[in-house]
Amino acid sequence: MFKFNEDEENLKCSFCGKDQDQVKKLVAGSGVYICNECIELCSEIVEEELAQNTSEAMTELPTPKEIMDHLNEYVIGQEKAKKSLAVAVYNHYKRIQQLGPKEDDVELQKSNIALIGPTGSGKTLLAQTLAKTLNVPFAIADATSLTEAGYVGDDVENILLRLIQAADFDIDKAEKGIIYVDEIDKIARKSENTSITRDVSGEGVQQALLKILEGTTASVPPQGGRKHPNQEMIQIDTTNILFILGGAFDGIEEVIKRRLGEKVIGFSSNEADKYDEQALLAQIRPEDLQAYGLIPEFIGRVPIVANLETLDVTALKNILTQPKNALVKQYTKMLELDDVDLEFTEEALSAISEKAIERKTGARGLRSIIEESLIDIMFDVPSNENVTKVVITAQTINEETEPELYDAEGNLINNSKTSA
């Protein structure tokens, strides 16, 4: 309430002591007065403290090397992809840190990231580990579930709802989060030629995603699903949300070969054939993604492309044993809680890795293979006090026989079963 009491003399601001005729307005409270100048000063102090809190949070941003070191603890191999991600993520959050009063006219634009690699090569794990490293909200979405507005399926805004939920509905936190959109290659146009048939999960979805990739204020239904005219919406600005797009892009090697073929005319076929799959992917360019079916505007919003290599037996064995949360360590700990030691022979680790390659599941399939070999043991061991040690051998994996079981004195107690 604004009030001047003209019956009283010498009304003063209770904070700065100025008389009412020295200021524009004097606001009366319960026995106190505050002038417009002190109100402005208080407002500035509050804004500075809020900005300082944001700045302090961002000063904890790790360097690219520190990000890379943390990724190395959980993700084996894929050095080039990890380095590209570390630099891109560092620059992204440094850009957010720079936001505020502009000292010059240079505006740093957001750079979203595309991860291209086969199933089980570590795309999702890289994105998850990045979010944990930076302690920001993280959400995963599957592009195959998205359709353009008006068709059965999810609206692209539902991706943002998952991030908001991950941030416990703290919009400020969500606006600095990371969203990983998997299977992005599945929304490529079915052909480079525009068809009269509606491609409801292709170009239309790319157009819808385009808006949130480049930065917009989106209206998100708090309960998910389709929007309704009278529904209350959550407003979220996507300008500072980092999008990581992942996809296998099966067959893109042929697209790259066709492009390279235009430049190797006159050479022998052997010269052109020397490009193996990894070497081809290393030479991927925006025009290859366009030929695959992504629209130019969409590609322009994802300027950073990192390639993930197909994992070989050695890499998969390292994944089984080396990361902080390696599967072998997890299952060893699980049986340790029942006072049972678990061991994997080198041959068993090789057999697990070879089976994952055979199934074309990459690192993603390692857990299911181990689970298959241990399910009976994990069922029986808690009620069998004689077993103190379990050894997984190559025979266990390849022939689906029972692991070797030992008692406290080191005696093999299921010899007849393992040789059956």
UniProtKB/Swiss-Prot annotation:
The keyword Zinc applies. It holds the Pfam family zf-C4_ClpX. Disulfide bonds: none annotated. InterPro entries: AAA+_ATPase (IPR003593), ATP-dep_Clp_protease_ClpX (IPR050052), ATPase_AAA_core (IPR003959), Clp_ATPase_C (IPR019489), Clp_protease_ATP-bd_su_ClpX (IPR004487), ClpX_bact (IPR046425), P-loop_NTPase (IPR027417), Znf_CppX_C4 (IPR010603). Residues 1-54 form the ClpX-type ZB domain. Coiled coil: none annotated. One of its GO terms (molecular function) is ATP binding. ATP-dependent specificity component of the Clp protease. It directs the protease to specific substrates. Can perform chaperone functions in the absence of ClpP. Component of the ClpX-ClpP complex. Forms a hexameric ring that, in the presence of ATP, binds to fourteen ClpP subunits assembled into a disk-like structure with a central cavity, resembling the structure of eukaryotic proteasomes. This is ATP-dependent Clp protease ATP-binding subunit ClpX. It comes from Staphylococcus aureus (strain NCTC 8325 / PS 47).
